[in-house]
Curated annotation (Swiss-Prot):
Annotated Gene3D superfamilies: P-loop containing nucleotide triphosphate hydrolases
CDD domains in alphabetical order: CMPK
UniProt key word DNA-binding: no
One Gene Ontology cellular component: cytoplasm
Matching SUPFAM superfamilies: P-loop containing nucleoside triphosphate hydrolases
Location of this chain's protein in the cell: Cytoplasm
Top class in the EC scheme: transferase
Name of this protein: Cytidylate kinase
Record gene name: cmk
Organism expressing this protein natively: Chlamydia felis (strain Fe/C-56) (Chlamydophila felis)
Keyword annotations: ATP-binding, Cytoplasm, Kinase, Nucleotide-binding, Transferase
Superkingdom of origin organism: Bacteria
Binding positions (ATP): 7-15
Keyword ATP-binding recorded: yes
Sequence similarity: Belongs to the cytidylate kinase family. Type 1 subfamily.
Amino acid sequence: MIITIDGPSGTGKSTVAKALAQRLKFNYCNTGAMYRTLAYTHLQEPWNCLSIQELIDNPPFSFSFISEQPLEAFLDGHRLSEELGTQEVANAASRLSQLPEVRSFMHKLQRKYAELGNCVFEGRDMGSKVFPDADVKIFLTASAEVRALRRLKDLPKGSLSQEALHAELVKRDEADSRRIHDPLVIPEGAIVLDSSDLTISQVLEKILALVSPEMP
């Protein structure tokens, strides 16, 4: 069974998808972390001297595909975690995700991960492009103001103002929605959930109610 959760940044996709996978005992894939891994790598020496094509042809990074464990990213043997959460990396990932060769590379890895079996995938084009035949497709949304507040809590204190982060989110939304290759859209057949006034637990329960009838 494949469940996809798409939507813009700050809607709670990652938290909800991870909690959903834990409740269902499914595999969980944070596809945004995959793009951020590539972006982080390209920002570091000596890999910042390579082209993107060279990086994806012979990637120094890797991902763990282990059943019933969240996907983890490694660079040169070092597990990446907090390094992927900076705004600099997020902005770089947004730029790189516009490239068709990058999207094609990531889509192949994501479909490979799906071979593990029951999976929850979260991202921006999971239900529209990578898994159009997913069993359950969710599109999470929220107001830009709420999303900025949520993202602010995840960043180091004083790194960005709420106003600056709000502007970054609006800019990212526009780039994601207007990109030529695999833009951010509501997938056909997806259920749209607005999380602006909902807690993570409330969103999770709503999704579980949608998933339960589809369970084998």
